[in-house]
Amino acid sequence: MARRPRNSRAWRFVLSGVRRDQDGRSPALHAEEEAWGYDSDGQHSNSDSDTDLLTLPPSIPSAVPVTGESYCDCDSQNDPYCSSLHPFRQIKSCQCGEEDNYFDWVWDDCSKSTATVLSCDDRKVSFHMEYSCGTAAIRGNKMLTEGQHFWEIKMTSPVYGTDMMVGIGTSDVNLDKYRHTFCSLLGKDAESWGLSYTGLLQHKGDKSNFSSRFGQGSIIGVHLDTWHGVLTFYKNRKRIGVAATQLRNKKLFPLVCSTAAKSSMKVIRSCCCRTSLQYLCCARLRQLLPGSVDSLEVLPLPPGLKQVLSNKLGWVLQMGSNRSSQHKGDGSATTSCGSYSDSSCTPGHDNCQRKRCRRI
């Protein structure tokens, strides 16, 4: 009996049916992998290839870490993804952007999920040290009372998985509620607000597009203005936008969460000051001057006043200026004040200029 050639009409019919069946099962498989956290959060994957994950839209969580979004140009922060090394590769840490040596608050060892470990004087939090089986979170050790609060969180590990988030919330947020569930914890209810690494902003379970993605080496700034009740986010010391309003008289804390295995974040700045006339004037000056200008450099201020403002309100006057992004594309800056070290807790060189953030 002669064998029918594969380019015949019958074979084309069979192959088309197989393709339709595969297309119908593909969304269900992706949904199942996301629900259980396979591969994307450090678990074993039942797929033979990561090819499909590479085609996911930017807003969809992925097993592929986000790259190219670092505050600095250190090679370790912008290395292309390598599937044979992720997520277990060890990357040297840089110190870029870590100028402060006074911190108004750090992470609270008594208000954290079980899958978290603190280091660097409680400024660095590591999630899921071996493998991930859910969502872990931690809260700052100080309530954000009246005044102006600004802090920065640096992503010190590959950023990937179901979600890694930065935000705020009340003391009613249950940090261990989803320890066996992969989810976007911050903003899941009315008690918290969270910005995801995918660029989505979440509150009351509602998600909206807010920013571009962020990855390892990115610095996420958060400004809570309790006087006006406004929450603003920054990325790599550039303003993203207002995330929430009507937050006056709320008892809020800084929060972060992660579902990714062997992930970590670090507080590199935490400041607070009263809503004084001095602050309001500095904030207005920052609005009037071009975004790329360092207010302290261009204004004809006496040296003493310039130093006082730099110490107390430098984060207001310099945010968004070229000086705040001096490590971008500047290899000499990276070498002198942000050189590699085996530990991200190693202090910078003595000759590096440090900006103190003191209470007013």
Swiss-Prot record:
Q: Name one GO cellular component term.
A: nucleus
GO MF term list: ubiquitin-like ligase-substrate adaptor activity
Name the source's superkingdom. Eukaryota
Q: Which GO terms describe its biological process?
A: negative regulation of cGAS/STING signaling pathway; negative regulation of epithelial to mesenchymal transition; proteasome-mediated ubiquitin-dependent protein catabolic process; protein K48-linked ubiquitination
Question: Can you give the residue ranges of the SOCS box domain?
Answer: 264-315
Supply the SMART domains for this chain. SPRY (SM00449)
Q: Which UniProt keywords apply?
A: Nucleus, Ubl conjugation pathway
Q: Where is the B30.2/SPRY domain?
A: 84-274
Does the record's keyword annotation contain Nucleus?
A: yes
Where does the record place the region Disordered?
21-54, 322-350
Q: Where is the composition biased (Polar residues)?
A: 332-346
Look up the record and name the pathway of this protein: Protein modification; protein ubiquitination
Q: Where in the cell is it found?
A: Nucleus
Q: Which Pfam families match?
A: SPRY
Written domain comment of the UniProt record: The SOCS box domain mediates the interaction with the Elongin BC complex, an adapter module in different E3 ubiquitin ligase complexes.
The similarity comment for this entry is: Belongs to the SPSB family.
Assembly information from the UniProt record: Substrate-recognition component of the ECS(SPSB3) complex, composed of spsb3, cul5, elob, elob and rnf7/rbx2.
Q: What task does this protein carry out?
A: Substrate-recognition component of a cullin-5-RING E3 ubiquitin-protein ligase complex (ECS complex, also named CRL5 complex), which mediates the ubiquitination and subsequent proteasomal degradation of target proteins.
Name recorded for this polypeptide: SPRY domain-containing SOCS box protein 3
